[in-house]
Amino acid sequence: DVDDRIDFEFLHTMLQKIHREETQLHTAKRYIKYLRRAFDEKTDAGITFLGHSILGDWDIEQLAGAKVRNLGVPITAKLYLELILKPRLIKHFTSERVILMFGTNEITQEGWSPKAVCEELQAIIDEVKRQNPSAHIYTLGLTPTAMRVDRNNKDVLELNTYLSTHLHGTTWIELYKDFTDKYGKLDLRYSNDGVHLNGEGYKLLEKLVTERL
């Protein structure tokens, strides 16, 4: 009957949610293990990247004349805080500048909200300040998407607007407009899959970030 169908659909939805969360956790732990040497490294890097896969996939050794320590992991801000920052996995965390980029994974989650994402990202900013008080923190805005059913640009714009006006203790770097095509979507000159950046995309990202550092 109707009640049984509703109960089944609710259970199915909950099981899917649990499976997604378990998959994210497994992926996070695998990447953290892979990056363990980078977390432990004693380095004179002037810039540290903390964020999801768009930062993690950026193959760059120097940015604006400073050595880069890339600690990007394809997870949410919440998991980054719980699995990496709070346990203080990052040793020798002395970079003068820290660049953050989070949010694109959050908007694929059921029930997400700009306020909740902002609170999670603010918690990361506050934790970075505790561990590296002299660091200047920069937060990169989300880039647009194209050809994706799991993300839409209305959500991206809404989140960018909220984060840029509510985060504190960080310098916001807007990226959205520079990556859009004439239709307001991610220009596919800069991406092969509609979310992640390709070589040309990273060239543009380097230019935009360097101008603000």
Model regions and ranges:
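Conserved alpha/beta core of the MobA/IspD/sugar-nucleotide pyrophosphorylase nucleotidyltransferase superfamily
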Residues: D1-L25
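Short, amphipathic alpha-helical "lid/cap" segments that border enzyme active or binding sites
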Residues: F8, E82, P114, C118, ...
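Conserved catalytic region of serine esterases and O-acyltransferases that act on ester linkages
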Residues: T23-R30, K207-L213
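A short helix->loop->beta-strand "cap" motif at the edges of active sites that frequently abuts
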Residues: N132-H136
